[in-house]
């Protein structure tokens, strides 16, 4: 008989920096998951990714308290801020521009996000990411 999924937990954890403190500890602890086991497995899986980059993770907790997890690509907004070299987006994106991104940078981000975004070609993903950039107060060149 297959294990029954008891809960799905969605978190954003910094790559290579998972530890038992909030938000990881309380979220996993309330479902009876071994927190240190998750932290070690997550850090091992994300060691090739730039340390500190927020990584969305979906943890499936089973009825015997075991778990599996799937990591996603970093959010587009984080990748855009990194590409533009800004700390945060604009509070007033239509009037106050905080940086610029090029078409080549959008292409690179779209290719990175391709694994998570389904049903769209690279051009459609680029347009979607360009919209995100504009809503953050970034100028899209190209």
UniProtKB/Swiss-Prot annotation:
What's one Pfam family the UniProt record gives for this protein?
A: Ribosomal_L11_N
Q: Which GO terms describe its biological process?
A: translation
Q: Does the keyword Ribosomal protein apply?
A: yes
GO MF term set:
large ribosomal subunit rRNA binding; structural constituent of ribosome
Enumerate the InterPro entries for this protein.
Answer: Ribosomal_uL11 (IPR000911), Ribosomal_uL11_bac-typ (IPR006519), Ribosomal_uL11_C (IPR020783), Ribosomal_uL11_C_sf (IPR036769), Ribosomal_uL11_CS (IPR020785), Ribosomal_uL11_N (IPR020784), Ribosomal_uL11_N_sf (IPR036796)
- Tell me, what does this protein do in biology? Forms part of the ribosomal stalk which helps the ribosome interact with GTP-bound translation factors.
Q: How does it assemble?
A: Part of the ribosomal stalk of the 50S ribosomal subunit. Interacts with L10 and the large rRNA to form the base of the stalk. L10 forms an elongated spine to which L12 dimers bind in a sequential fashion forming a multimeric L10(L12)X complex.
In the record, the note on similarity to other proteins reads: Belongs to the universal ribosomal protein uL11 family.
**Name the UniProt record assigns to this protein:** Large ribosomal subunit protein uL11
What broad taxonomic lineage does this protein's source fall under? Answer: Bacteria, Pseudomonadati, Pseudomonadota, Gammaproteobacteria, Vibrionales
- The UniProt gene name for this protein comes to rplK
């Amino acid at each position: 008989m297959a294990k029954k999924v008891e809960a799905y937990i969605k978190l954003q954890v910094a790559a290579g920096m998972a530890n038992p403190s909030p938000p990881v500890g309380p979220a996993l602890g309330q479902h009876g998951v071994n927190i240190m086991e998750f932290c070690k497995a997550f850090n091992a899986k994300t060691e090739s990714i730039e340390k500190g980059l927020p990584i969305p993770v979906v943890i499936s907790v089973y009825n015997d308290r075991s778990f599996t997890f799937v990591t996603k690509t970093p959010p587009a907004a984080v990748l855009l801020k990194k590409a533009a070299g800004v700390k945060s987006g604009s509070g007033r994106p239509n009037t106050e521009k905080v940086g610029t991104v090029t078409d080549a940078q959008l292409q690179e981000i779209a290719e990175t996000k391709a694994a998570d975004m389904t049903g769209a070609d690279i051009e459609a993903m680029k347009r979607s990411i360009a919209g995100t950039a504009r809503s953050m107060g970034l100028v899209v060149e190209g």
